[in-house]
């Protein structure tokens, strides 16, 4: 019976980590400039799986003139000390709404909005440590810009709030040295911009909240012309602590197009979506993505991976209405069929958290490549302020086959079978793999406790241990083979 309180304690500790297959969270921000600041809405880009470039704005952006910029050269295992990016040229200290991308040479492109007075494009050849070229994109009235970088081409869309109102587009075909701009839509609202693998541009719009509509348009000639708008749904949205806009996202792969936004018609926030299976020609009815409708769900973001798997993340809190004591977490769902159905949601954030400020950013994003799904967000686990955090998961571990043909998960045995509670004799089973296998045990601080296996596994192999070989507590088993990876949480009772 004495073990029961300890077991409950350890189970509670185990709950304070991201659900596998997502890796333990890595802090991205470090209060650039030496100030205690609250990181807000963020964007990031991934280059060749190794280089990650991140930017965000601040809750204090009206008084602290900078965009915290961070980068990783090891796939997000760690991030270098942040650079407090600041440009006095626009003459406006309000640095906000940044977006970032990487071109075909690995050079970094970033756009920054200065209040609503102007928008500038920045170009770096050394991963953002210095910025070599600055280009004025547009002037007064700019709000909520989004950017797509493809090879030497850059596409930017934003809401124009003064002058010729509407959704505007800027396009560059020379790496951002010059831009052509023009109005492409007379409607206003929050827009979402995406590009599929065939270089079709997809544009979503939520207008006139608290009560408005959701629209879609498409360009098949790289922004020269745009299709007639399609009305997808009406919308309903009310602001609250932690969220203040029905931010939408759009992603496309093959003939599948998926658009999300935040809706509060049920009395609380939900992440809702419409989907198309014919390239945006026709659309489904609106449906709810989150599988827990209690409390509030907001800041949804969707991303198709290169194999057509669909990934969606959002902020979740069980509390309603939201306030400074609300406990938030980052949730995630995977769909193998373009959003027709979803697996149960997982938690990406290691812990729940409250936000010390109302502004948690209006958007945070997912990115993917041929191996991983990547996530970045801001949270208040530090208690005094909000910081950016990062996590990733192997596509093969969230139900994605490494190729164009889908393979249901049960066909390929898991590489590691292991009990999650160790008390006495322990048997770990390793399944055969073509690539060498490594298995190691780590403590909660990420320190390697012991290597348990290293080498080829031709037939099912057992690794036998006793729980008495290790101290009481929480551990992680890390199994790797080639590009595959599995992480399991272990609670150990020495016997």
Q: Which residue ranges define each predicted feature?
A:
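Positively charged n-region of N-terminal signal peptides that target proteins for export
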Residues: 1-4
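A periodicity- and composition-biased signal for non-globular, repetitive helical segments
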Residues: 8-9, 223-224, 494
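Hydrophobic h-region of N-terminal signal peptides that target proteins for export
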Residues: 9-18
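Short, linear, compositionally biased motifs with a strong N-terminal bias
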Residues: 10-11, 134, 455
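Extracellular, repeat-based ectodomains that mediate carbohydrate processing or recognition
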Residues: 18-398
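Low-complexity, Pro/Thr/Ser/Gly/Ala-rich linker/spacer regions in secreted
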Residues: 394-410
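C-terminal outer-membrane/trafficking sorting elements
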Residues: 406-495
